Amino acid sequence: MKTQRADYSLKVTNYNKDRNNYHCEVKLPIKLGWFYNVKLLIDDGNSISYRNLSHKKNEGDYAIFEGDVTLETSAIYRYCFSYDVDGRTYYFNANGLQNDSFLSDDCFKLSVNFEVPKWAQGKIMYHIFVDRFNKSNDNKLQEMPRRVIHDNWNEEMHLGPEKETSKIYGKEIWNIDFYGGNLKGITEKLDYIKSLGVSILYLSPIVHSQSNHRYDTADYENVDPYAGCNKDLKVLCDEAHKRGMKVVLDAVFNHTGNDSKYFDEYKSFDGEGAYNNPMSKYSNFYKRHYEKGKIYYDYWWGFENLPECDCESKEWQEYITGVGGVIDKWFDLGIDGLRLDVADELSDDFIEKIRIAVKRNKVDGFIMGEVWKNPMRMGRGYISSGKCMDTVMNYPLIDALLRYYKYADCNKLDYIIRDILREYPEETINSLMNFTSTHDISRAINYFTDENEFTEYAEWAWDLKNNDLNYLKNKKLSKEEYEKAKEKYKSYLFALYFLPGNVSVFYGDEVGVDGYGNLLNRKTYPWGMEDKDLLEYFKKLGKDRNNELFLETAGLKLRDINSDYFSYERIGPKDKMLVITNRSGKEGRILIPPEYNDEKTKIYTLNKSTKDIITPYGAIAIKKAC
């Protein structure tokens, strides 16, 4: 890693990866005077230490100081160097030359023992809710207990509990209406997905489950019959790999379903589940407590269809991560990585074992976690230990971006971006999941309407004022509302596509699928009724992003965030790019830095913006050599 400011340069080189040995070289201009006490200062998060650097030689007008340091612990280190001259101490950090005290937040950052697979950095991801994406013609669904089958792909989904089924079982049973989207259906559409520039396919859970979302696992070892079979997963992975795409599977290891072979509340399986048999071989899989001599099982957030697993249980860990266990079986079928559901509720020890199992199968296996807050500040080793996950879903950034584009909240966006740059490992930043939307929040297009359905000062930008499903069901966008929202949406997408991380497109966002809140956001993909204009825009963004390979790992520098414009730079070893987006409906004049005004630039635009004029909801990206 080399950093240079004017006459100063600092280079830190990892010359022995196995031992984490680093060599530090500092170049200082001789004209400044007689240097002494040249030191490298290192903050490991717990304490600040220093290494004396020795004068090795003079090279032209520079004095060269060098030294070696061993960083044994996986951590994010912050460092700078200092020197004394004429009786004063100077610090050289990320902000340039300072003559005041050492401040860790201003230091350069060095991530030790953090390696994310190259294929998972700076790519485009496609997130599929399997039941709602595409149904192959041969998928004839057979009736099964506690399942409802739709006759028509385009008919409305069921909202709320299924009345008849709930009555039979004496409790509310939701999300059991199926359209039949399946793995073969996805395989049939791989060329379409590839046309969006996608190289990572992220599938919602596919294993046997009672519900259509399949976060209530019934059998980890077999694909749900409505989604296909294990062979179909193998074929999908093989065909995806032929097209240069990797496959990431949603992994739900925090809880199972109550209607599963492990819990088996309804005796749907062999009756040997933990619910009816305290001596079951599965009973140690679950969290439980005793009251008056009776066993009571714990349920995830009180949902009675989701008994909570005991992540500290050796039996449970072995079943999932042991040799020949669940993870091994999935990787045998060809997957390339996992997204850990509710990762913040899994123990670090369990996640470490998951990582060992993943890497046992594929050295470049990828692990992404569902963590909603800054993972570096939760007192956990999700990322910082270097032994758990590679990256997380980027809820903080998406929340801040949405607030900026809807409410002009400049401060939040500035704070979150600087927070991420300061605290996350570089390769984690490059692989963050920057999503258009997900199965848990409203569709992106809804957010950009003038409708006042969202709460500006809620915890999250997508929090709704009214969560009543019947109310939200009737909130349909008019053509005029949709087109106006699409203008803003495009500007937002332009900014999103050029930022660090993986852009994740939730199926249907590229063609204008709408829906407020959880459930209504899970409509079927509208084959034959797509918004072709929006689709072409997504294809163009994907092509533009993939054309600039340096963006996969380029750094990020904020330029300006004001009530109209958001601008930033991406800076790589050989190329850099200036990005400016207009969140307002006003045309404006912009002042481009001189270095971006030469003839040797490449330009990407939205709404015919130029280097002089940025159009309403327009944008421009200018790439040049460094």
Regions picked out by a protein language model, each given a short descriptive name:
Residues D131, Y382, N434-D468, L472, ...:
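Aromatic/acidic polysaccharide-binding cleft in carbohydrate-active enzymes
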Residues M125-H127, I200-S204, V248-L249, L338-R339, ...:
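Structural recognition of the beta-strand scaffold that forms the well-ordered cores
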Residues V130-I200, I206-L333, I354-R360, R377-M378:
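Substrate-binding/active-site clefts of carbohydrate-active enzymes
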